[in-house]
């Protein structure tokens, strides 16, 4: 399928175009092809929802398309509006099947598209639900600094770590030693009552299993509390 054919088909079916930009030497690209793209659930969702193209960024018209859409790392997943031929959602990196399907779902929700999220963040949008979407997106593309900065802003804006949606975002996206981990440890009984001992212990155990020795020793009391 050529680019022109994909655009025409996407317009006719009123679908976005999905492009998997890869290279022959890209290890994560091969891993995604073998372990994620080949799964029936993933294939069914993407085939039903998008016009799909797998494009070698270093061969043929892939060179032009990669340059046009600013592809600098591999794999890059680009979702294109066929009417304008502009990219509306971008993702990347190795993802689990669940993450990859969610990436596709987000592409079809205008308020969860990467370009919308970045535009709104730049304009100063710091609404709670928006920040959580922003955090989840940047976690999915391994932009850890953006995740941490946005989570800090979420808390500074009045959200509490004990709020269910904030706790979920913390568990899923914030890693390593930080003040939030200490807050969980210092208020262990309260967090266990709210979210269950198993979930709290799992988070503490995960985050204290690596890091600088001095940091781990500083949080030694956590280990006394955890029994999993």
Residues of each region from the PLM?
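Oxidative protein folding and maturation machinery
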Residues: 121-228
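Short, solvent-exposed loop/turn and secondary-structure capping segments
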Residues: 29-33, 65-66, 89-92
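Short active-site neighborhood of thiol/selenol oxidoreductases, capturing the structured segment around
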Residues: 12-26
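CheY-like receiver
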Residues: 99-103, 113-132
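Non-catalytic, surface beta->alpha helical segment in thiol-disulfide oxidoreductase systems
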Residues: 71-115
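Thiol-based oxidoreductase modules, predominantly thioredoxin-like and allied folds used
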Residues: 1, 21-23, 32-62, 71, ...
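Loop/turn elements at helix/coil->beta-strand transitions in domains of secreted/extracellular proteins
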Residues: 13-17, 48-51, 74, 82-86
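A short beta-strand-turn-helix
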Residues: 1-16, 46
